[in-house]
Amino acid sequence: MKNTVKLEQFVALKEKELQKIKGGEMRKPDGALFNLFRRR
Protein backbone atom coordinates (compact mmCIF):
# COMPACT_ATOMS: atom_id res chain seq x y z
CA MET A 1 0.00 0.00 0.00
CA LYS A 2 2.96 2.31 0.64
CA ASN A 3 3.93 2.09 -3.03
CA THR A 4 0.49 3.39 -4.06
CA VAL A 5 0.84 6.45 -1.83
CA LYS A 6 4.34 7.11 -3.17
CA LEU A 7 3.05 6.79 -6.74
CA GLU A 8 0.26 9.30 -6.07
CA GLN A 9 2.75 11.78 -4.59
CA PHE A 10 5.11 11.17 -7.53
CA VAL A 11 2.36 11.80 -10.10
CA ALA A 12 1.19 14.94 -8.27
CA LEU A 13 4.75 16.24 -8.22
CA LYS A 14 5.19 15.56 -11.95
CA GLU A 15 1.87 17.29 -12.72
CA LYS A 16 3.10 20.41 -10.92
CA GLU A 17 6.33 20.33 -12.93
CA LEU A 18 4.39 19.90 -16.16
CA GLN A 19 2.15 22.85 -15.31
CA LYS A 20 5.22 25.02 -14.70
CA ILE A 21 6.88 24.12 -17.98
CA LYS A 22 3.75 23.57 -20.16
CA GLY A 23 5.87 21.98 -22.88
CA GLY A 24 6.56 18.66 -24.58
CA GLU A 25 10.14 18.68 -23.31
CA MET A 26 9.21 17.05 -19.99
CA ARG A 27 6.97 14.41 -21.56
CA LYS A 28 9.69 12.22 -23.05
CA PRO A 29 11.89 11.81 -19.92
CA ASP A 30 8.77 11.79 -17.72
CA GLY A 31 7.31 8.88 -19.70
CA ALA A 32 10.57 6.95 -19.50
CA LEU A 33 10.82 7.63 -15.78
CA PHE A 34 7.22 6.52 -15.25
CA ASN A 35 7.83 3.26 -17.14
CA LEU A 36 10.91 2.62 -15.01
CA PHE A 37 8.88 3.38 -11.89
CA ARG A 38 6.12 1.01 -13.05
CA ARG A 39 8.52 -1.93 -13.41
CA ARG A 40 9.15 -1.89 -9.68
Swiss-Prot record:
Residues excised as propeptide: 1-24
Alphabetical keyword list:
Competence, Pheromone, Secreted
Reported function: Acts as a pheromone, induces cells to develop competence for genetic transformation.
Q: Could you read off the lineage of the organism from its UniProt record?
A: Bacteria, Bacillati, Bacillota, Bacilli, Lactobacillales
Q: Identify this protein by name.
A: Competence-stimulating peptide
Give GO cellular component annotations, separated by semicolons. extracellular region
Protein origin, superkingdom: Bacteria
Q: Which intervals of the chain form a coiled coil?
A: none
Q: Name one GO biological process term.
A: establishment of competence for transformation
Between which residues do disulfide bridges form? none
Q: Name one GO molecular function term.
A: pheromone activity
